[in-house]
A protein has these predicted regions:
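Positively charged, low-complexity intrinsically disordered leader regions
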Residues: 2-45
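Short, glycine-rich nucleotide/cofactor-binding loops
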Residues: 38-44, 196-200, 277-284
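Conserved phosphate- and dinucleotide-binding cores of soluble alpha/beta proteins
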Residues: 219-220, 225-399
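Intrinsic disorder/low-complexity segments
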Residues: 119-152, 339-348
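N-terminal active-site beta-alpha-beta segment that forms phosphate/nucleotide-binding
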Residues: 53-118, 149-251
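PLP-dependent amino-acid enzyme catalytic core
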Residues: 25, 31, 37-47, 77-94, ...
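Short, hydrophobic/aliphatic alpha-helical segments
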Residues: 39-55, 87, 181-189, 273, ...
Length: 399
């Protein structure tokens, strides 16, 4: 998407790859909206750390980052032994997989890269690696490079990662096309967390219908939940919408029910980090379940927008989804930029952490929750909008 900085407008993707330096290039999302900065990860360990530490976040964005990270790790290998190369790839794969356990997209993305590598003639290394994890690749993408030597496999890895990222953008465009039909002139929408272009390679999932509706000339308004404890709604979604000229207000997380009760919200669209293909259950940022319950209570449609890589075809229950628990400090305080007018010790213009909670109290910090399928009106995918219960019936098409 386009970003305007100091009067200059430029197009950016959330994640790209510098093949010359073998580096992943990311937008440092922890600094937004106060500072726009690009960072580079020099090896797969730094790439995994960038995912874990939320320099990059959002299921589709960390999926593309994982794909690039696997290719980065593959290209860093020095040697000719395919057996040693396979062991190295396993190490890279497992480190990146462990960075954010709730999202299924990184695993699916890396399996897609492995599938692309397996297209080379006599590439049993990647055929074997494709079976090492539970999530199955949904497609085979590869470059017209054949051979079973390490250098050919490295070239295939990068080609597959690039194609995964480009396909992710195409899927977001399709999500926007299908989801825009839900947005009418004068609509007031609610979105939770950030499922915009910053959470993807470009365009976004939950925001894709908004941008498509905007391009079609429709007028609407968006409420952004602040989304404590990391405030991705207040910091990232609000920044995105401001950059694109979409009318919006940031609201406290607990204000959504009040606005629904007063008839001020017509539609809810969120993203997701994992949707179960068997049941339609949805894992997303903590607080999504609460919004879905409120929407159901007030008869408001609740939609979830996802790329195909977010669908998990293996787990049978939402209770099986691993829920990441993050550091308690995120709940006990907040990051921000001092205005210089607040209490003593807060310096103007300086990004810093301020403790809010009682000094002797501890906190619990589950980062995600699971919304049962019965609370979800529909799943917006690149192939259309489906009822949650339809996913399994359409698995041949969607998988």
């Amino acid at each position: 998407m386009n970003v305007t900085l100091r009067g200059r407008t430029q197009h950016f993707r959330t994640v790209t790859f510098d093949a010359v330096k073998n580096e992943v290039v990311l937008i440092e999302q922890r600094l937004l909206p106060h500072e726009f900065k690009l960072v580079r990860t020099r090896d797969f360990r730094e790439t995994a750390a960038a995912i874990r530490d939320m320099i990059v976040r959002g299921a589709p964005a960390i999926a593309a980052t994982a794909a690039y990270g696997l290719a980065q790790g593959a290209r860093a290998f020095r040697g000719k032994s395919l057996a040693a190369f396979a062991g190295h790839l396993r190490k890279v794969y497992e480190m990146i997989e462990a960075a954010r356990p709730t999202a299924v997209d990184p695993v699916n993305a890396m399996n897609t890269v492995l599938a692309g590598m397996a297209q080379g003639e006599g590439a049993p290394v990647c055929d074997r690696l494709l079976t090492i994890r539970h999530a199955q690749s949904r497609q085979h993408v590869g470059a017209p490079v054949h051979g079973n030597d390490v250098s050919a496999q490295q070239a295939l890895a990068l080609a597959a990662a690039e194609e995964f990222a480009n396909q992710s953008v195409r899927e977001c465009e399709a999500i926007g096309k299908h989801g825009a039909k839900l947005i009418r002139n004068g609509s007031n929408m609610l979105t939770h967390c950030n499922a915009g272009w910053l959470a993807c390679v470009d365009i976004g999932t939950a925001t894709a219908p908004m941008y498509a509706a905007q391009a079609a000339g429709r007028k609407f308004h968006v409420f952004c939940d602040e989304t404590r404890p990391r405030c991705q709604g207040a910091s990232l979604t609000a920044w995105e919408l401001a950059q694109q000229g979409v009318p919006h207000h940031v609201i406290a997380d607990n204000a959504a029910g009040h606005l629904m009760q007063r008839g001020e919200i017509d539609l809810v669209i969120t993203g997701s980090d994992r949707v179960l293909g068997r049941t339609g259950d949805v894992a997303n940022k903590i607080g999504t379940y609460t919004k879905a319950v409120l929407a159901k209570r007030h008869g408001i449609p609740f939609y979830v927008a996802i790329p195909l890589s977010t669908i998990d075809w293996n787990l049978k229950s939402g209770f099986e989804i691993p829920i990441e628990v993050r550091d308690e400090s995120e709940v006990l305080g907040a990051w921000g930029v001092g205005t210089g007018t607040a209490e003593r010790g807060v310096r103007g213009g300086k990004r810093q952490f301020v403790r809010v909670a009682n000094p002797t109290s501890s906190a619990r910090n589950p980062a995600f929750d699971v919304t049962p399928a019965e609370l979800v009106t529909g799943i917006i995918t690149p192939l259309g909008i489906f009822k949650p219960q339809e996913l399994w019936k359409r698995r041949r098409e969607l998988a």
